Amino acid sequence: MANSKQAKKRAGQSEKRRQHNASRRSMMRTLVKKVLAAIEAGDKEVATKELAAATPTLDRYASKGLIHKNKAARSKSRLNAAIKAL
């Protein structure tokens, strides 16, 4: 438990940041799942459209440090390869 005023403030800030990041991470995962669902359905046109929506989000969160830049690159690459294989 926080013993000082500064530690209490930092604990509150950390919790607020954790909730904010969890929301963003959830949104990002949902966008990726939409692409995967379109790929599973075999709908190349919808999958391409969904990937176009997910790509800037992955890049944005990689630049902000929410996910590692290599994870963003790997995700985009694998999704794109799966779409091309349709």
From Swiss-Prot:
- Which InterPro entries does this one have? Ribosomal_bS20, Ribosomal_bS20_sf
Query: Which GO BP terms sit in this record?
Result: translation
Keyword list, A-Z: Ribonucleoprotein, Ribosomal protein, RNA-binding, rRNA-binding
GO CC field: cytosol; small ribosomal subunit
The answer to whether UniProt assigns keyword Membrane to this entry is no
List, alphabetically, the Pfam families matched: Ribosomal_S20p (PF01649)
Q: SUPFAM superfamilies given for it?
A: Ribosomal protein S20
Any idea what job this protein has? Binds directly to 16S ribosomal RNA.
Family listed: Belongs to the bacterial ribosomal protein bS20 family.
Q: What is this protein called?
A: Small ribosomal subunit protein bS20
Biological source species:
Colwellia psychrerythraea (strain 34H / ATCC BAA-681) (Vibrio psychroerythus)
